[in-house]
A protein has these predicted regions:
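Short, small-hydrophobic-rich alpha-helical interface motif
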Residues: 1-2, 158
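Intein/HINT protein-splicing elements and their conserved insertion hotspots or analogous self-processing inserts
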Residues: 164-172
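A generic structural signal for well-ordered coil/turn residues at beta-strand boundaries
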Residues: 124, 150, 170-171
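C-terminal cap of metal-dependent C-N hydrolases
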Residues: 51-58, 63-64, 128-165
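Short, flexible loop segments at the rims of nucleotide/cofactor-binding pockets, characterized by
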Residues: 37-40, 107
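His/Asp/Glu-enriched, well-ordered alpha-helical/loop segment
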Residues: 4-32, 46-132
């Protein structure tokens, strides 16, 4: 059993308690023992900082989460639905239209993806159809592998995505 399996899902503080070490020492040991091959889920971001980032004109919404281990970040399964359900629909912190723009056309433009992010002739038809009142993010730190709710259809390159088949050229 590798070290990461033994500690998967535990916080650095919990591992420090088990190993009777300081948290910083635990992090260094884990990095060394796993040849830098660890993943860390940080959930301590200040909500006000996140709000300011999302509101900022240059702020784009994305996730760098990966499916690593049994306890990936809950945002792996709910970054975009969290923006739609909480930030736009419930808290009205950002308009739905602006939130979608910050998740689609703005990043595509900034990254130079010329046929992505907008619904136009000769563009890739990448579309998510959702039922706004039903959009929900059940993923939590303790139970992160929960699919978002309220997403009715996902269309990538003009094809309906079924059974997680990877349709996009960048995903193949």
């Amino acid at each position: 059993m590798c070290i990461r399996d033994r500690y998967d899902g535990l916080s650095v503080s919990e591992i420090a308690g088990i190993k009777k070490q300081e948290p910083a020492e635990v992090m260094f040991d884990l990095l060394l023992d796993e040849n830098l091959g660890i993943s860390y889920v940080g959930l301590g971001a200040n909500p006000q900082t996140l709000h300011e980032f999302v509101k900022h004109e240059a702020g784009m919404i994305a996730s760098d989460s990966i499916l690593f281990g049994a306890h990936p970040s809950p945002r792996t399964f709910g970054t975009f639905t969290k923006i739609i359900s909480e930030y736009a629909r419930d808290d009205k912190f950002i308009t739905l239209e602006r939130g979608i723009m910050k998740m689609s056309s703005f990043p595509a433009q900034r990254l130079g993806l010329k046929s992505k992010g907008l619904i136009l002739d000769d563009y890739d038809a990448d579309i998510v159809v959702f039922d706004l009142p039903k959009v929900n993010v059940p993923a939590t730190k303790s139970n992160p592998r929960q699919l978002s709710e309220g997403i009715e259809h996902v269309i990538v390159n003009g094809s309906f995505v079924i059974n997680l088949f990877l349709m996009g050229w960048s995903l193949r």
